[in-house]
A protein has these predicted regions:
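Conserved PLP-enzyme active-site core in the AAT-like
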Residues: 2, 7-14, 118-299, 304-307
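Secondary-structure capping and boundary motifs in well-ordered enzyme cores
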Residues: 90, 119-126, 156, 160, ...
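Structured alpha-helical segments in the cores of large, soluble enzyme domains
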Residues: 95-103, 160-164, 188-196, 314-321, ...
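Non-catalytic terminal extensions of PLP-dependent enzymes
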Residues: 1-111, 132, 138, 142, ...
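Short, glycine-/Ser/Thr-/acidic-enriched flexible segments
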Residues: 159-161, 182-183, 208-210, 245, ...
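Active-site C-terminal subdomain of aminotransferase-like
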Residues: 251-254, 258-370, 376-381
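A short glycine/serine-rich beta->alpha loop
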Residues: 26, 59, 82-87, 113-122, ...
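A generic structural motif
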Residues: 177-183, 231-241, 297-300, 312, ...
Length: 478
């Protein structure tokens, strides 16, 4: 009888009249029998309905809009594995062209036909590759000098993205962190150098700090390192984590020196699926010259029909994102990227100004140097408020927006902030809708007679340990 019902569901029964739609979706075991594609599609699609719509997700840095031609091109390549270079040699060529384009955007001095770089599944893998290269170069030099090489370290601000903590744990490399303060909101070069020694593999400035949106001053760090290395005899290099800024600075601030124009910058990592304007996941890392990419990082296999050499932590990876990146470079060109990033920046600055005018709030920084920023409650308002920024996050989510609230990293953990990332697809009109929803929520909060549960919990936590109440599920994610 069930077979008859299944045939009817497939041929003539409406999807929501089918037996499958009366049953729960599988959660632990694979179903015994096949399901028609129409019903399977609907069941999976229904699972996504309660979620925030991607373009309203202002927590993420990830691209949520590409044009129809880009989407079509990527869909047509969904079955292509990048690593199969023998079968798909043109994909590898396009990846190499993308590396060349980015290397030249970042003023690479390398004269080779193909610049030294690697594809990654995201900026996290790209950071790992840049860090590993610095570690292997340092280790090789220490071995050659007959010196110990068992205690490597690197220096970064407390505004680091979690990948650097993973890097430290996985490769057992000490991470030395330079604290941020309200007065010093980016990496302090002198403090960074005070943490360096003969075991320092690199210093990592960040262009587009995940927590704040600000840029570390790479040029100032480079000048300081020039003097430091000359005095000590060390040759500590810089790896720039430009997950966001790598696709912003070349187009909006081309004269700013943060890249390979600086002596000690030997590698740069970025994300193609953030402001590179490609759907996830895609990252890139470029070295100043092939000599800075250790041979130990290249691995070869011969079981795919030819001898294939690659640099990366992952092996198989989708080719669609490579086609998407190459398409964007061709489709948009320099001026197209500049126009899109300029629009995002202009809208971010507009929102920054409007939120700064709202009675409860104060912006973390007067500057908007990337298309994102953070703000917090004014201390005098916070002392008597019956609500918190976590409540505002929840209220906005009821209207479809995702605007995260979170605590800042160590040394600033008493500050709960909110952040908006302005990406391609976030228009001025949508921004006005968001600002209206924010103001409406604040108006309702100010009518409260009693504090919210989050406010009670936060105040209690402050009295007990002197820290703000933290929603552990809210992250500043990348």
């Amino acid at each position: 009888m069930s077979n008859v019902n299944e045939q009817r569901a497939t041929i003539e029964t409406p999807i929501f009249g089918s037996e499958k739609m009366r049953n729960s979706a599988p959660t632990e075991t694979i179903p015994m029998h096949p399901t028609s594609p129409e019903i399977a599609y609907q069941m999976v699609k229904d699972e996504t309905f309660p979620q925030t719509q991607p373009r309203l997700n202002l927590a993420t840095f990830v691209t949520t809009y590409m044009d129809d031609y880009a989407t079509k091109l990527m869909n047509e390549a969904i079955d292509i594995n990048y690593i199969d270079e023998t079968e798909y040699p043109r994909v590898a060529v396009m990846a190499a062209r993308c590396i060349n384009i980015m290397a030249n955007l970042w003023h690479s001095p390398e004269q080779a036909k193909w610049k030294a770089g690697a594809l990654a599944i995201g900026s996290s893998e790209a950071c790992m590759l840049g860090g590993v290269a610095a570690w292997l170069r340092w280790r090789a030099k220490r071995k050659a000098q007959g010196k110990p090489y068992d205690k490597p370290n690197f220096v970064i601000s407390t505004g680091f993205q979690v990948v650097w903590e993973k890097f430290a744990q996985l490769w057992q490399i000490e991470m030395r962190t330079v604290p941020l303060t309200l007065e010093k909101t980016t990496l302090d070069p002198q403090l960074a150098l005070s943490m360096c020694d003969e075991n320092t593999i690199c210093v990592v400035p960040i262009e587009g700090v995940t927590w704040t949106g600000l840029n570390d001053d790479v040029e100032a760090l480079d000048r300081a390192l020039e003097d430091y290395n000359a005095r000590t005899g060390y040759d500590i290099p810089i790896h720039v984590d430009a997950a966001s800024g790598g696709y912003i600075l070349p187009f909006l601030d081309p004269d700013k020196k943060w890249d390979f124009r600086l002596k000690w910058v030997l590698s740069i990592s970025t994300s193609g699926h953030k402001f590179g304007l490609v759907y996830p996941g895609l990252g890139w890392v470029v070295w100043k010259d092939k000599k800075y990419l250790p041979d130990e990082m290249s691995f070869s296999v011969n079981y795919l029909g030819a001898n294939i050499t690659q640099v990366g932590l992952n092996f198989s990876r989708p080719a669609a994102q490579i086609l998407g990146q190459y398409y964007q470079f061709i489709r948009l060109g320099f001026e197209g990227y500049k126009e899109i990033q300029s629009n995002s920046m202009d809208i971010a600055r507009y929102a920054h100004e409007q939120i700064g005018k709202m009675a409860p709030f104060e912006n973390y920084s007067d500057d908007v140097v990337n298309p994102l920023f953070i703000w917090y409650m004014k201390p005098e308002y916070d002392r008597t408020a019956k609500w918190t920024l976590y409540d505002l996050q929840a209220a906005l989510q009821q209207n479809g927006w995702m605007v995260p609230a979170y605590t800042l990293p160590n040394n600033l953990q008493n500050y709960v902030v909110m952040r908006i990332v302005f990406r391609q697809g976030m228009s001025r009109d949508m921004t006005d809708m968001l600002l209206t929803d924010m103001q409406n929520a604040i108006t309702e909060f100010e009518k409260l007679e009693y504090p919210t549960q989050t406010r009670v919990a936060q105040n209690k936590q402050q009295r007990v340990v002197g820290k703000v109440f933290t929603h552990t599920h809210v992250k500043a994610g990348r």
